[in-house]
Amino acid sequence: MSRNLRTALIFGGFISLIGAAFYPIYFRPLMRLEEYKKEQAINRAGIVQEDVQPPGLKVWSDPFGRK
């Protein structure tokens, strides 16, 4: 196996590993917004935002909202 091919395979494997790690963290929630909105509504039910927000910080907004 040539040295360039081996380097390309190692680099490609590394990039694939990073992509596989980021898929469930970043890309899957972006593709399934409604599912994650429902899940977050269930997870955050009963939490009063003002009670958990540290004083002096901006109140957290909807992470799925677009600017």
From Swiss-Prot:
Q: Where are the transmembrane segments?
A: 7-27
Ordered alphabetically, the record's keywords are: Amidation, Membrane, Mitochondrion, Mitochondrion inner membrane, Secreted, Transmembrane, Transmembrane helix
Q: Which InterPro entries match?
A: SMIM20 (IPR027917)
Q: In which tissues is it expressed?
A: Expressed in the ovary, specifically in granulosa cells of follicles that have passed the primary stage and in oocytes (at protein level).
Q: Any one Gene Ontology biological process term?
A: mitochondrial cytochrome c oxidase assembly
In the record, Phenylalanine amide modifications are located at 64
**PANTHER family under this entry?**
SMALL INTEGRAL MEMBRANE PROTEIN 20
**Protein name, entry field:** Small integral membrane protein 20
Q: Organism source for this protein?
A: Homo sapiens (Human)
Q: Which gene encodes it?
A: SMIM20
